[in-house]
Amino acid sequence: LENKNFSSSYQYSLYEKLSQLDDTTQKVEINNTGANKKYLYTPYSVSKKDVSSSLIQKDLNLKSNALFGTKNYSYTETSSVSPSELMTGSNWLNQPNKSQKKYLDTEAVYRQFVYENYQTVDQGLEKTIAHLFDQDEFENTGIYSISQHIRDTLTKYMKYDEKTNTQSENVLEDFLNQKISGNDVLFASAAVEAFRHYNIPARYVEGYLLK
């Protein structure tokens, strides 16, 4: 995929360019004061030109080319005012031109990888996830309703504690069984398993809130 100029690191930027979307462009400047400097912290909507000089680690992360990492850098990103789960496909998906067809072909390869690797609930957690998230009925009309249901379930049944020790072997299972409170890592991990339970590919990532 890399040889065909496709990467999940700037996938939305490619799609946006082909769709001629009119999202707001913003320049973001980063001053890394405490995070690991060997990685670059960018959003999903970063433009290709801003990440092409970094080391793209498949669909995992972006690594700095600098020997001791990068402290200060900037990039351009495009933000939509709508939640990502509400995004709808562009009309050209049904009748693509040559460039759009090339994108669709490479995206299909990556999509197959995603569904093969990010759609299965971790072994041993299937019944626990089903018990927690299926106890309340909801109208499943797609990804938006599922996202809201997961938020509602976590808010209703789980307790937050930023000081939770996440080092024990069965910490996620204990959290899902409501034996312990959870921090941001456990809430995010539970949400990933829940999305997979509802057949939506998801994976755990770490990041920062940009305000």
Outline where the language-model segments fall.
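Weak global preference for isoleucine
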Residues: 18-21, 28-30, 46, 51, ...
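Sequence-level detector for tyrosine residue identity
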Residues: 10-15, 39-44, 73-75, 103, ...
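Active-site neighborhood of thiol-dependent amide/isopeptide-bond enzymes
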Residues: 136-211
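Intrinsically disordered, low-complexity N-terminal segments that are enriched in acidic
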Residues: 1-102
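Short, surface-exposed glycine/acidic/tryptophan-bearing loops
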Residues: 81-130, 143, 147-177
